[in-house]
Amino acid sequence: MARPPLDQVRTIGIISHIDAGKTTVSERILFYTGETHKMGEVHDGEAVMDWMPQEQERGITITSTATVCTWRNHRLNLVDTPGHIDFTIEVERSLRVLDGAVTIFSAVEGVQPQSESVWRQADRYGVPRICFINKMDRVGADLRGTLRQMEEKLKARPVLLQLPVGEETGFRGVIDLLAEELITFADGDQGRTVSRGPVPADLLDAAREGRDAVAEAAADFDDAILADLLEGKDITAARLRGALRLGVLACRIFPVLLGSALRNKGIQPLLDAVVDFLPSPLDVPPAKGKRPGSETVDELPCDPGGPFCALAFKVQSEDGRKLTYLRVYSGTIKAGGAVWNSSRGCFEKLARLFRMHAHKREQIEEAAAGDIVAAAGLKEVLTGDTLCDPAHRIVLEGLAVPEPVVSLAVEARGVDDRDKLLPALEKLQWEDPTFRVHEDEETGQTILTGMGELHLEVVVDRLQREFGVGVKTGRPQVVYRETITRAVERREIFRAEHEGKVQGGEVLLQLSPLPRGAGVRVNVPDAAELGIGKELRDAVADSIGRACSAGARTGYPLTDLEVRVAAIPVEPGVTTDAGVRAAAGRGLMLAARDAGPTLLEPVMNLEIVIPADYAGKVLGSVQQKRGRIEGISSQGDTETIRASVPLAEMFGYMTELRSATKGRGTYTMEFSHYDRAPIEVLRRFGLEA
């Protein structure tokens, strides 16, 4: 595939709630662009983009997958992402490097909880989006209701570019409001043949009204269109597209298209919209980064002739080696070239470069600005690292990584498994920043922590399948947080003799509680203000951060407190980096123990969808779980319950809900916040109520 001009490149992702149809849309895109010659189906376990055995068995996407295809002479770098909240890091790291996104909504379920989550993630990164309302052929499809939910729940401004032709199972095509044409999709050739014709007479009034609404939205971004509207002049589709594109790039409007991916309807117009409305690498702001050891911010325009710079947004373990996914923001690099890893402070070699097609590789000789590629040979790299030209060193902003909330104890089944367990876990940690491993100091058990039960279930399954490691597991446990309830001050002095020489350190720490959700703030004045060297100052800051991660009483990380270093007295000939590290770490732990330590538990936002007949039974169950009902809504014979519930009460809830609703209830949940743990939990850890 020849390299197209940058204005003919679209680097996009497919994002949505689980089961809205992301992977089915992706499979149709690959089919209609000629990349595949057979439609892969999720329900048959044959989707190209869902290549992991765990994905094929469960019918869900677990890991983000990249591929490349072509439409209207434009290269589409396409990333399919998971919809389950347990794998939110895959969405996070994809959105970090995407220029645009297609958000899929189900016409039946509307805007679901994970739809809201991925929308917020895209907002945070400023990713322009178009929307595809899928499953228009399903009984209960509600276009107007979905648009209303987009406005109310997402605070978005949807601009409907199509009208449906036929309702529910009678859905057969769409009216293109820009071109003022009927679009239908042939049933006999899997939707390959797209026919355009005049708008049916009975839909002319609705089409004119819909086009007027589109023109009014476009007028907000083009004064000439506004003037023509006021004068009653006709406005061409090309002018409307140009104005709408400005609104999309500014993330102020979100064009909406319609279809049924499973029934092969609506995908080709969606591809046209990707080309027409979503940005090229030249349309997005330049990548920004800081020079190492400096606060100076540099901008990197997307220029193949500029200094090389790329972000490692994903690391995958393959046959014990790292395969690293890169988004190239500037410059060009050839296979075999050396780069500087600004995040690790070392040189790395890009031994080989690949263009990925799901899990299949196409070896390439070079990568340039605007590309998403995979590289073999990088040894030290981790997710979020910056790779750059050694002569132009820069550190790009990394990824926002959520904290894991569920833990699981594992132990090897046999002696052979014991030798393989930790190396296998290390490789899985390469891939997933939300997956953590540590050893329980009291029991010696290996503890896995992750984003949820399914997350850790998949990890254990991969240990057995991919690495041949047999493990026994305990019950999932909540990952609590420690915090303090009152302010304290502590002076800590450390002294030790090493090889006949006294080494020591002294710090004065002030701890104070912060509001819920504030995290940890470590306030260490500048070295000059403290009257010490920068090395000592940095040693104290690092030691305090590590001590906060280790906790004070229970081993759970500290949060929602401020640590201020008031003084670091220096005794010539005695004070050392190691000494002040020891004083700071021990001082923090002992100060927190004196500050009224308590535990916080994770609270989840829960959404339950059930037949109305079971609402009373399920509501009672939620309240018994210390849940707080946030709202109840009805749609036909279905009730949707929104509640906040402590995670500790939710283990095994799917089985309980299925039993209570005879298999007809479903639920989704995502992390909301931490709140005070109940008295029985505090007592279990020997803390005061």
Swiss-Prot record:
Keyword GTP-binding: yes
Keyword field contains Protein biosynthesis: yes
GO BP terms in the entry: ribosome disassembly
PROSITE patterns from the UniProt entry: G_TR_1 (PS00301), G_TR_2 (PS51722)
Principal subcellular localisation of the protein: cytoplasm
Record-level GO cellular component terms: cytoplasm
tr-type G domain ranges (all copies): 7-282
Residues reported in the UniProt entry to bind GTP: 16-23, 80-84, 134-137
SMART domains membership: EFG_C (SM00838), EFG_IV (SM00889)
Gene Ontology terms for molecular function: GTP binding; GTPase activity; translation elongation factor activity
InterPro entries according to UniProt: EFG_II, EFG_III, EFG_III/V, EFG_V, EFG_V-like, EFTu-like_2, G_TR_CS, P-loop_NTPase
Cell location: Cytoplasm
Role this protein plays: Catalyzes the GTP-dependent ribosomal translocation step during translation elongation. During this step, the ribosome changes from the pre-translocational (PRE) to the post-translocational (POST) state as the newly formed A-site-bound peptidyl-tRNA and P-site-bound deacylated tRNA move to the P and E sites, respectively. Catalyzes the coordinated movement of the two tRNA molecules, the mRNA and conformational changes in the ribosome.
Record-given protein name: Elongation factor G 1
Organism: Geobacter sulfurreducens (strain ATCC 51573 / DSM 12127 / PCA)
